[in-house]
Amino acid sequence: TNKRDTIRLAFGAEGDLGSTGWEYSAYYQYGETQRAQVSTRQFNAANFKYALDAAQNADGTYYCKDKTADAFGCVPINVFGIGSITPEMSNWIIYNPMTFSNIKLHVAAFDTTGDITLGDYTFSAAAGIERKEESSFELPDGLQQKGLHGGNQIPAEIGDQDSTGMYVELLFPLIEGMPYVDNLVMETAFRQDDYSTIGKTTATKFGLLWTINDEWTIRSVVGEAVRAPSISDLFAGASQTWTGIPDPCAGLGTEQGGSTNANVIANCNSVATVANAITNGSFDAEQGLTVPGLAYSQLNTQNIYGMVGGNRGVGEETADTTTFGIVWTPTFDPNLSVTLDAYEIEIEDVISQLSASVAIRKCFEAAPASFPNAFCDQHTRFASGHLESWSSYVVNQSFYKNKGMDLAIDYTFDDLGAVPGSLSTSLVMTRLDNHMYRANDEDAGTDYVGEIGHPEDKAKLRFLYTNNDLIVSVDTTYIGDVVDDLSFDHGVGN
């Protein structure tokens, strides 16, 4: 079962600040969601252990040796033979897992807008302050947290953060009523937030809006944006998984030979435990003998586990954005509007979890002079040289760059002749020139344009018919050719 209770309260006010000509708006919002999730008839590994550890009474019956478990009704279990497990035994080793979660948010804000006059010059301004407090927790029961419910460990997640932010926006008219400059306006904005978890962050914006005449407008904005880590990014517990990852060193020293990459071969041989296995062989427990090279049996592969979770040391990610656009609204047909925008977005210190398989590959494919590198910290090995574990925690390590163009054409047919109502059409086309991802400063980067999820060309055409209360919409979407990354030549070994 899954029971969810949600409450939301919001209060707001707006008005004039006396006779100053300034206006204000203020609000307070509170929201809370509680969830109780209960599953049924899951395996109780702890009770199963107690049930197996049984002894025989003088009368031939059995009892659980653990006195505490016995006091709580432990039922000895017989796992041998068809039908040997009775309903009483079954009921002792099953239970109903429970998980409780809560998300709570308080937000209060005050904003004001108006004009500022300095002599003969007037410009517009807006300013505000915001206070936000958020907290959340997710608490699996004790067996789930210990991994004794027949599955992986599911840790508790408990965290909170609060922030106080303030912003100022200014709009300056520069030129108006001149040839080729019907209006020129400059806008600037600044915002600073102080987080209880990561400290202070700032965001800025600078833009120009140049109205040439009634038909043509040019616009451009340069800004810096910030995204703070979420509670989950910061406080998510380390979850266990038994998903294996490929070892670049596997097969070296065997008849198959393993990797042919010179960097991989050199780096693997520089790790003492791996080099020993490559030279002297590795023990195969399934066969009970030593086999050549660093060979992986099914048992070796199944023993690899991973840990995935948050990181209280993660910081904010920042983005530098640049846009430049042209708007055409022809006077001969006011129902037509055409906009063309070019954009470039660079995001640094991206909050992300790098794939463990990618990390270990980049660890060993690096030039020997830079080995071991930061990627190598995300895995450990047994003394035999085989992989033991991998980790993937939230970090600030990645870089994204998006660059492209958007074209939008809108037209409205007000008069459909004998057909009542109106018809609006909208065509939006996107050309993606660059979608670069770089895991960290040591990574040369990969351009994913043309791969699944990042087509070079996309388009969406919409027809919207309205007639009083009747609304009919028809959409069609075009996605350009894409390829699977397994067959796409990145030059990085995929």
Tell where the protein language model's regions lie, with residue ranges.
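Transmembrane beta-strands of outer-membrane beta-barrel pores
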Residues: L17, Y28-A36, I129-F137, L174, ...
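Transmembrane beta-strands of outer-membrane beta-barrel proteins
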Residues: W22-A26, L118, F123-A127, D182-T188, ...
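Outer-membrane beta-barrel channels and translocator barrels
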Residues: G18-T20, T117-D120, S163, I175-V181, ...
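Hydrophobic, lipid-facing positions within transmembrane beta-strands of outer-membrane proteins
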Residues: I7-F11, K104-T112, T164-L170, T202-L208, ...
